[in-house]
Amino acid sequence: MADARRPLTAGERALAASVFRDTIDYDAVRLSRSKWAFFQPRDTVMAPRGCIHFHPKGQGWRDDFAAAALTDQGLFIHEMVHIWQHQRGIFLPLARHPWCRYDYAIKPGQPLHRYGIEQQGEIVRHAFLLRRGAKVPGAPSLTQYETLLPFRGA
């Protein structure tokens, strides 16, 4: 299958901007229905170098994440955290090791960059879901997330 890349839709740009404000170059972002590497599992989404890769036989691809279910939008926001990290100069193929943790405990006063790269993705995803009224089991209050995120303002 040829690499089917596309830019963000207008809705996806607005969805991402509702979280990241102007901290991402949205014109540079691409979504691809191709594996990033031969070892990418079918239902794993990867965004190591500024493009979000969906396995062509996986179930994650959406034509427009802004029109998708809230859980799918949460996945999109998690992957956009990796785009944000990449655009800040983090070389994710080296920063993301096989034992990266997704689970986290918010520590008062600890800035987002002090959490692991996958923990950052989950923290931002959970804040996004809470803002939209979803329940996130075990999550602290939205107020705690809001003090942690560096995208406030705008």
What are these regions (language model features)?
Residues 1:
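Acidic/histidine-rich, surface-exposed loop or edge segments in extracytoplasmic proteins
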